[in-house]
Curated annotation (Swiss-Prot):
It is a multi-pass membrane protein. The chain crosses the membrane at residues 22-44, 53-73, 76-96, 121-141, 153-173. InterPro entries: YciB. Keywords: Cell inner membrane, Cell membrane, Membrane, Transmembrane, Transmembrane helix. Signal peptide: none annotated. This is Inner membrane-spanning protein YciB. One of its GO terms (cellular component) is plasma membrane. Plays a role in cell envelope biogenesis, maintenance of cell envelope integrity and membrane homeostasis. HAMAP family: YciB (MF_00189).
Length: 183
């Protein structure tokens, strides 16, 4: 449900962009994001740090995009956010030796340290790849192509990353289930 709420502003942005243009799409994105943050807060009683960061960046860069009628600001947002997430994951692992992924999921999963580290590194690499893809598409292709890829391409890539994560974790989850059944 939460993921669906997070996807709605993006779909609205895409539809308004295709029908009306950049300025109206950016305003729609900002308003839909504000509404989405409020709904998540009401329904789930909490906003995650990443939701605050993404939400505020959408609002700031969306307002700049609407004001200047220039999609470049939203293009930068995607690059900056992906770079920021990658940096946080890498710093948490290599500087503080406490992978963010472990901090987020340790209550649900008990995994060996090397698995947490690989998982954390895998997601950092994913965000770096998304950042680089965004730079390439935003600079070498039309705004229409970028908007389409931003809406559907990154969503598809995220789904693939989640599936790969599930496949990677499956043996460990199965092992945990077997251990719990034996108790």
């Amino acid at each position: 449900m939460k993921q669906l709420l997070e996807f709605i502003p993006l779909i609205l942005f895409f539809a308004v962009y295709k029908l009306v243009g950049v300025q109206a799409a950016a305003i729609t994105l900002v308003l839909a994001t504000i509404l989405q943050l409020i709904l998540v807060r009401i329904l789930f009683k909490k906003l995650e740090t990443s939701q605050w960061i993404v939400g505020l960046s959408v609002i700031i860069f969306g307002i700049l995009t609407a004001y200047f009628d220039d999609l470049a600001f939203l293009k930068w947002k995607v690059t900056i956010i992906n770079g920021l997430f990658a940096a946080v994951l890498l710093i948490s692992q290599y500087v503080f030796h406490k992978p963010v992924v472990k901090m987020l999921l340790a209550k649900e999963l008990s995994l060996p340290t090397q698995v947490w580290n690989r998982l954390n590194l895998g997601w950092a690499i994913f965000f770096i790849i998304c950042m680089l893809i965004n730079i390439i598409i935003s600079q070498l292709f039309s705004d229409d192509t970028w908007a389409t890829f931003k809406t559907f391409g990154f969503t598809g890539l995220s789904l693939v990353a989640v599936i790969i994560t599930g496949i990677y974790l499956y043996p460990y989850i199965k092992k945990l289930e077997n251990n719990n059944e034996q108790k």
